[in-house]
Amino acid sequence: MLSMFMCNNIVDYVDDIDNGIVQDIEDEASNNVDHDYVYPLPENMVYRFDKSTNILDYLSTERDHVMMAVRYYMSKQRLDDLYRQLPTKTRSYIDIINIYCDKVSNDYNRDMNIMYDMASTKSFTVYDINNEVNTILMDNKGLGVRLATISFITELGRRCMNPVKTIKMFTLLSHTICDDCFVDYITDISPPDNTIPNTSTREYLK
């Protein structure tokens, strides 16, 4: 299943990603009339990922547009409030992860797109995804594969239009990805005062 695109693609590029980084720096529910229906837990729901990320594909009526506006507002307020509460150290780690994951996504854009398209033809539960990622990270201790996994899971979240399933996936996968290896990498990269130097991304990655 997931191994068809995760193991055969991400792992195939682990060495390239690691070396590159080292060199650079390092819904339908509301329409259900069966009141006895038992809804599946989020972790047991099947994930389907669409090849198209065009949001207009999901906004066909005025109600769809209004609901999306409300959802965006509520989500943004929640994230903005969370960011305001974060200490400087956490914000500095956010900046580091932004820099590195953006670099991986840009440098390996073609490879990532191949994996996204392959994922679009499959369906998985959150545990399918988590188990595959866990296996990959146990076998590969490099920083590159962890950054690639973050970028990959983030893009899958963009293509999964169900926000409940997306949040569940992000929550569980963040626990799996942030193993001792990744924590050590990020804390080693972080400047002593937990601030990001005011330099270009390229300079910082050298």
From Swiss-Prot:
The keyword Cell membrane does not apply. It comes from the Viruses. The keyword Membrane applies. Transmembrane segments: none annotated. Induction: Expressed in the early phase of the viral replicative cycle. It is found in: Host mitochondrion outer membrane; Host cytoplasm. GO terms for biological process: regulation of apoptotic process; symbiont-mediated suppression of host apoptosis. Keywords: Host cytoplasm, Host membrane, Host mitochondrion, Host mitochondrion outer membrane, Membrane. Gene3D superfamilies: Blc2-like (1.10.437.10). GO terms for cellular component: host cell mitochondrial outer membrane; membrane. Homodimer. Interacts with host pro-apoptotic protein BCL2L11 (via BH3 domain). Interacts with host NLRP1. Interacts with host BAK. Plays a role in evading host innate immune response by inhibiting host inflammasome activation. Interacts with and inhibits NLR-mediated interleukin-1 beta/IL1B production in infected cells. At the host mitochondria outer membrane, interacts with the BH3 domain of host BAK and prevents BAK from binding active BAX. In turn, host apoptosis is inhibited. Belongs to the orthopoxvirus OPG045 family. This is Apoptosis regulator OPG045. It comes from Vaccinia virus (strain L-IVP). The lineage of its organism: Viruses, Varidnaviria, Bamfordvirae, Nucleocytoviricota, Pokkesviricetes. The gene is OPG045.
